[in-house]
Amino acid sequence: HTLSLHDALPISSAAAAGSSGAGSSADGSRATKRVTIQDADGERTLEAQELMVAVGRSARTEMVGLDAAGGRTTKSGIAADENQQTSVPHIYAIGDVTGRWQLAHAASADALAAVDHIAGKPNYSNRDIVASCVYTRPEIAAVGMTLDQAREAGHEAVEGAFPIAANSKSSIMGEATGFVKIVSDEKSGAVLGAHLIGPRATDLIAELALAMSAEVTVEEIGATIHPHPTVSEAVMEAIH
């Protein structure tokens, strides 16, 4: 099969190709979808079996009335500080509308931070470290920086990896596709990022997010005995 990627292009229309007008997709198979795009050469129509479209999301703040109350908005959404407090002291904003992490678990953490601030209590959550999860099969999860990003940030970064195919529990489950990659600082051993593809990746990422938040080193993770057989052993093995 052939996969064609077209990014940052305006879409004029998209529809089912229909039995009467269906043509052939790039690999010669029967096309079932049709999309009209605009590129440097003008408007053209593409036909394929499937379309994957990532349209993105933007905050709808114009109807909130925050501007009238003296609040400040940005292109990303409503501006809020680390306590989720806006420029209007009695108004707080959490979650997607702030334009930071558009994730449910991040929004929950924002809410707790806002409530703690209102109640005059300290909040210890580290909302700079937020894992992202994709609930496909195999699952995908990531937190922190990639190897390239870590090096660009000035770290002497290294990466350890372990194939899921070599993990006993994954083989038992019949889900042996994927890997665990852990990015760390070569001198300090600090975990800078982690990227997982495979069974239970969305569960395993919490261990690595905790390591980053608690400043646990890769040596300490590797020295922790992980039970056998479990998918979590892949985290330990990526460090070994």
Where do the model's predicted regions map?
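Short, small-residue-biased leader/transition segments that mark boundaries at the very start
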Residues: T2-L9
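Conserved beta-strand-loop-beta-strand element in the redox core of flavoprotein oxidoreductases
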Residues: A15-T45, L51
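Short beta-strand to alpha-helix junction loop
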Residues: A26-S29, A54, G99, Y135-M145
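Short, acidic, Ser/Thr-enriched surface-loop or helix-capping motifs
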Residues: A40, A80-E82, D185-E186
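FAD-site-proximal beta/loop scaffold in flavoenzymes
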Residues: T45-A119
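Internal hydrophobic alpha-helix adjacent to the cofactor/substrate pocket in enzyme cavities
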Residues: H105-D128, H155-E156, A214-V218
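Flexible, glycine-rich terminal cap/loop adjacent to redox cofactors
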Residues: A119, Y135-H240
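Flexible, acidic loop-helix segments that line cofactor/substrate-binding pockets
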Residues: N123-E139
